[in-house]
Amino acid sequence: MRDAFICDGVRTPVGRYGGALSAVRTDDLGAVPLRALLDRYPQLDLERIDDVIFGCANQAGEDNRNVARMSALLAGLPQTVSGTTINRLCGSGLDAIGFAARAIKAGDGDLLMAGGVESMSRAPFVMGKATAAFQRQAEIFDTTIGWRFVNPLMHQQFGTDSMPETAENVAELLNISRADQDAFALRSQQRTALAQQNGILAQEIVPVRVPGKKGTVTEFIVDEHPRAEITLEQLSGLKTPFRKNGVVTAGNASGVNDGAAALIIASEKMALAQGLIPRTRIVAMATAGVEPRLMGLGPVPATRRVLERAGLSINDMDVIELNEAFAAQALGVLRQLGLPDDAAHVNPNGGAIALGHPLGMSGARLALAASNELHRRNGRYALCTMCIGVGQGIAMILERV
């Protein structure tokens, strides 16, 4: 079986909800990192690109009808290059990379572009059609995040806890304190601030040209969700709106954000033929299901499964990128895997609590960050893992070349 490699990747800055990227359509946003990679590697024979695979969780607005294909065309890829959109909710971007890797390993492709995009700012309101004549009970949903058009049987059998409520469930089950969650959130902010100061995050980012009033254009180049100056006192003073006497706050949870990322995935032979450098081998990937009300613990079985497939242990990992949907679930995962709360190799440059969590993009961001960090610290293996709404987890192991 052939190996698949990450050759390079870029991402946009992550925008706040209603922030700098809210003026950019989702399909245009997805085109930005694709176009940047094409500009970086003008020698690429674009006709040899087998597919563009993007993750996107919403797909109810401008990201509808296969946003990967739309973004590929808008980026200037030939019409002969196909595109498909993956939806595994929060894990979509990482899953897209996995699909690309499997295509190469199976001999169904040699050169692919994979990543993800999400504009939560531009998520629309949706309304279902009437199911009977003269029906006047139309439901309207904000598609930014969470459940919509719920099947009554799903609600009866599994519940429909909101994402913050699932984090409260994990905290209650594993006795994770508010103080520990706020301390974790502060570390995320501090590590992100240091990575910004040291130019580490800038190495991943390509600018987005944002249209303004009267034809003006602004270049957006810096993640805008981090709060570098926040203190533990401020975090501990935030309200817990999701449950009475709860522990989950806006400060120890990830944000609602906008962004896009893309990576070049290739076989070794094709990479060398196209003037690319294989940087990181995609070793293995796994997914797993858990109880939906405890969705935040999904990375635990997914990680155990991918480690078993790779013949490795958690102690072999030099870098771990664990998506910080909530401090409660991130701490739950770390403790279940036998890792300390403040492990230096876990999210060394911060995570989603500080950077934000554009759902379809986040997994691709994790893979890009892990690949780059392996090379920075001369490590060998990295783990990327995420929880997923409705009770799933996804995990991928990378190896530095």
For each predicted feature, which ranges?
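Conserved active-site "lid/cap" helical segment
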Residues: 1-71, 75, 166-178, 188, ...
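Condensing-enzyme catalytic core mediating Claisen C-C bond formation in acyl metabolism
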Residues: 1-26, 145, 230-297, 301, ...
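N-terminal extracellular/periplasmic Venus flytrap/periplasmic-binding protein-like
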Residues: 11-12, 23, 27-32, 43, ...
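Conserved catalytic cysteine-centered active-site region
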Residues: 24, 56-112, 144-147, 157-163, ...
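Active-site-proximal alpha-helical scaffold in enzymes
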Residues: 86-118, 171-200, 262-269, 334-335, ...
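Flexible glycine-/small-residue-enriched beta->alpha junction loops
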Residues: 111-169
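Active-site pocket-lining segment
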Residues: 168, 204, 212, 283-354
